[in-house]
């Protein structure tokens, strides 16, 4: 079964608590991924907090997202 994000909750800074479809829960630090043009706006913590679940992963209004497998392995 491929991992899929079912819940996500902002913790602080660039940390998001993520729950996956197999019940696994993790607090993930997204800061290491905030490089390159698509992720640059996410360096603003106000913008970073605008994430949403776009099944099967977490995404932002500008189209940025990170593969759910990458999140699961983090």
Predicted regions and their residues:
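Motif-centric detector for short Cys/His coordination patterns
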Residues: 1-74
């Amino acid at each position: 079964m491929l991992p899929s994000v079912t819940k996500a909750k902002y913790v602080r800074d660039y940390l998001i608590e993520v729950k996956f479809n197999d019940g696994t829960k993790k607090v993930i630090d997204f800061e290491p991924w905030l490089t390159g043009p698509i992720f640059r706006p996410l360096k603003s913590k106000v913008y970073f907090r605008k994430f949403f679940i776009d099944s099967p992963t977490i995404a932002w209004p500008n189209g940025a997202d990170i593969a759910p497998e990458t999140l699961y392995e983090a």
